[in-house]
């Protein structure tokens, strides 16, 4: 038997809270026929970020799988189409990441300098027949599940009645998801208690003219949404609830929150869209060209929320407008997730 040579040790940046505090670099990755090299060496050298220990990959509106390779350690992460989540990273101060995908397109990805437990959950907007762009969840609900859950023949009861098959729940599992793709049906048993890995509290809403939104959103006027009538498509824990003011944070739920807001509109393709998230006295505003929002434009933020126990103050507020035209045909998907 040949001896296996073991190389020398490598200093990595995992398992420690950085002294400079939590930092994330937000980006939108565009794949066009080839892999993309993300080089954060300059950001590291100038002190903008102290290292990368976690990736947040948002593929809710992306129909292909994405692979991220760390050339310094050889680690390779693959994120499935239609999911979003946090992936622990094994990296050094090389600060280079190779990103590839099975199809061309754009998707948000955040580089985070502190460790977050693995947490991956399905898209909150997956619709009928598996169409991620459909305005509604499949079967009226979307199950939050452990990304590692899977099952084999041992969970299938082939002695059931003709034309039927029984699927046994995974031990400690939270449910079974059935997705109708038209020519085939996918049955998946979920496990892990439905906690979404490191995500303890999360809420996903769909806001449109048919789900609580006004018939028209005025041009160039950011007015906070009344989310009391928004459709709840995904909910984890009890720390986040919808209200007329926005997404209410429960007492004792201070921490870091991942906020994403995606808008689609097929009628207004000129000017710019303004997307705003507010918490307390802080406003976060992003401007997106209207032409990009026909396929979906996203604001993705990491916000530390200090919950004071005062309901009128402990609320995330959302608003959107076009700077030149009123909106009458829109779908807005809003997700807030407590990650630590």
UniProtKB/Swiss-Prot annotation:
Keyword Ion transport: no
Subcellular locations according to the entry: Virion
Segments forming domain Collagen-like: 123-141
Ranges for region Domain-2: 142-340
Keyword field: Capsid protein, Virion
Chain positions covered by the region annotation Domain-1: 2-122
UniProt keyword DNA damage present: no
Gene Ontology cellular-component terms listed: icosahedral viral capsid, spike
Function comment: In association with P31 and P2, forms the spike complexes located at the 5-fold vertices of the capsid. Essential for viral infectivity.
Oligomeric and partner information: Homotrimer.
Domain notes: The short collagen-like region is proposed to act as a trimerization signal leading to the fulfillment of the symmetry requirement of the minor capsomer.
Annotated protein name in UniProt: Spike protein P5
Gene this protein is translated from: V
């Amino acid at each position: 038997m040949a001896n296996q040579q073991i190389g020398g040790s490598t200093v990595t940046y995992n398992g420690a809270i950085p002294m400079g505090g939590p930092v994330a670099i937000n980006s939108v990755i565009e794949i066009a026929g080839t892999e993309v090299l993300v080089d954060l060496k300059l950001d590291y050298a100038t002190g903008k970020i102290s290292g990368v220990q976690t990736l947040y990959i948002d593929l809710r509106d992306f129909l292909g799988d994405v692979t991220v390779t760390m050339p310094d350690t050889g680690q390779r992460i693959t994120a499935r189409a239609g999911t979003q989540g946090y992936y622990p990273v094994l990296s050094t101060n090389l600060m280079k990441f190779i990103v590839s995908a099975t199809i061309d397109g754009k998707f948000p990805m955040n580089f985070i300098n502190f460790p977050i437990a693995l947490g991956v959950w399905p898209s909150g907007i997956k619709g009928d027949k598996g169409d991620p762009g459909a305005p509604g969840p499949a079967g009226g609900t979307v199950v939050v599940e452990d990304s590692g859950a899977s099952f084999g023949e041992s969970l299938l009861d082939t002695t059931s009645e003709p034309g039927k098959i029984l699927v046994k729940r995974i031990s400690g599992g939270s449910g079974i998801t059935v997705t109708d793709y038209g020519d085939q049906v996918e049955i998946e048993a979920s496990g892990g208690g439905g906690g979404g890995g490191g995500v303890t509290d999360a809420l996903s809403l769909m806001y449109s003219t048919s789900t609580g939104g006004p018939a028209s959103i005025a041009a160039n006027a950011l007015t906070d949404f009344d989310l009391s009538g928004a459709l709840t498509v995904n909910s984890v824990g009890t720390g986040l609830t919808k209200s007329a003011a926005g997404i209410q944070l429960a007492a004792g739920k201070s921490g870091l929150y991942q906020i994403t807001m995606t808008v689609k509109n097929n009628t207004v393709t000129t000017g710019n869209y303004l997307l705003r998230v507010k918490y307390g006295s802080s406003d976060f505003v992003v401007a997106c060209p209207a032409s990009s929002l026909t396929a979906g434009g996203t604001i993705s933020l990491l916000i530390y929320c200090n919950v004071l126990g005062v309901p009128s103050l402990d609320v995330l507020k959302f608003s959107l407008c076009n700077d030149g035209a009123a909106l009458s045909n829109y779908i807005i998907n809003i997700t807030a997730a407590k990650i630590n």
